[in-house]
Amino acid sequence: MDRFVWTSGLLEINETLVIQQRGVRIYDGEEKIKFDPGTLLLSTHRLIWRDQKNHECCMAIPLSQIVFIEEQAAGIGKSAKIVVHLHPAASNKEPGPFQSSKNSYIKLSFKEHGQIEFYRRLSEEMTQRRWENMPVPQSLQTNRGPQPGRIRAVGIVGIERKLEEKRKETDKNISEAFEDLSKLMVKAKEMVELSKSIANKIKDKQGDITEDETIRFKSYLLSMGIANPVTRETYGSGTQYHMQLAKQLAGILQAPLEERGGIMSLTEVYCLVNRARGMELLSPEDLVNACKMLEALKLPLRLRVFDSGVMVIELQSHKEEEMVASALETVSEKGSLTSEEFAKLMGMSVLLAKERLLLAEKMGHLCRDDSVEGLRFYPNLFMTQS
């Protein structure tokens, strides 16, 4: 922790923000520091940590101070962490929250997930080393040369040597396991290509395959599920997660919506999506939050809430006038219909059928007879006959 220096949190000249994540707690080695969880920012030059409550409390560490990083999986009651191993602090270091530390590493604990994406972006920055290619303000530079009177260099070299030996041993042990995984990935690639060809054939469908074959192929594709579902572990628990989830929902729901007349209840969507996601189940709250972003992201779907509170997902091209006209035509042909009868005729859920009839009633095209036998809708002759 003695490598951190106080900072304003503002980006320096030629410094670019890469990614940020809320709910990150810092450990000095294995010890939890006094600060509450805050926001961790990764730039091209620094790791910056800012207190979520007191924004004036902000500290940073140059990426040039990092030796290497490693992941630490989550456990029972423990969050996933990124372990950051550091060079010794420079003698001319600017003031920071800690004057000295016995540890040569820190841990970043991700309370609100997002560690997978953050680790990936941090690894990229450590590989590209962009801070060396761009002019860096003097305040960001750290003297990594040997300091007079310091004898810790030998200890650091020894630790690095042991870590390197341990890494080689680990690589040797897991190489055989990855051989099987590589074979599986090759097969997975073939399966993806096969699924794409099947999907294209279904889409074109110019008499090459029968209706029964189409249904069977679609069931195969559905059972295969989503290849790479959006998760909190990848994108965190904030707006970024819900935005990515909304984009994925738009991709997997457009075809089912077109088959169902352009509208589905949120309950149907929830079941369909979770079936496709397999083990990565989605909570109702996350589904609703993602659906609320569909229209703002200019995606082909939108969330609609009826007066009764029923939520549905519909295509942007889905027109209310056409829906009401279809309901009026069907009721006029039969003379009168209940929600159950209308649902059976239209091939939709009773919930959506009732909402469609209520909407037609609200617009004055239908009227109701609410009796002990149930709710029945009739064409509104008061509007059509004088």
Curated annotation (Swiss-Prot):
GLUE N-terminal domain residues: 1-88
Record GO biological process: protein transport to vacuole involved in ubiquitin-dependent protein catabolic process via the multivesicular body sorting pathway
Listed GO CC annotations: endosome; ESCRT II complex; late endosome membrane; nucleus
Alphabetical keyword list: Coiled coil, Cytoplasm, Endosome, Lipid-binding, Membrane, Nucleus, Protein transport, Transcription, Transcription regulation, Transport
InterPro entries in the cross-refs: GLUE_dom, PH-like_dom_sf, Snf8/Vps36, Vps36, WH-like_DNA-bd_sf, WH_DNA-bd_sf
Subcellular location: Cytoplasm; Endosome; Late endosome; Membrane
Start and end residues of each GLUE C-terminal domain: 105-138
Matching Gene3D superfamilies: 6.10.140.260, Pleckstrin-homology domain (PH domain)/Phosphotyrosine-binding domain (PTB), Winged helix-like DNA-binding domain superfamily/Winged helix DNA-binding domain
PROSITE patterns the UniProt entry points to: GLUE (PS51495)
PANTHER family: VACUOLAR PROTEIN-SORTING-ASSOCIATED PROTEIN 36
Subunit comment: Component of a complex at least composed of ELL, SNF8/EAP30, VPS25/EAP20 and VPS36/EAP45. Component of the endosomal sorting complex required for transport II (ESCRT-II), composed of SNF8, VPS36 and two copies of VPS25. Interacts with VPS25, SNF8, TSG101 and CHMP6. Interacts (via GLUE domain) with ubiquitin. Interacts with RILPL1 (via the C-terminal domain); which recruits ESCRT-II to the endosome membranes. Interacts with ECPAS.
Domain notes: The GLUE domain (GRAM-like ubiquitin-binding in EAP45) mediates binding to ubiquitin and phosphoinosides.
The protein, known as: Vacuolar protein-sorting-associated protein 36
Species per Swiss-Prot/TrEMBL record: Bos taurus
Native organism taxonomy: Eukaryota, Metazoa, Chordata, Craniata, Vertebrata
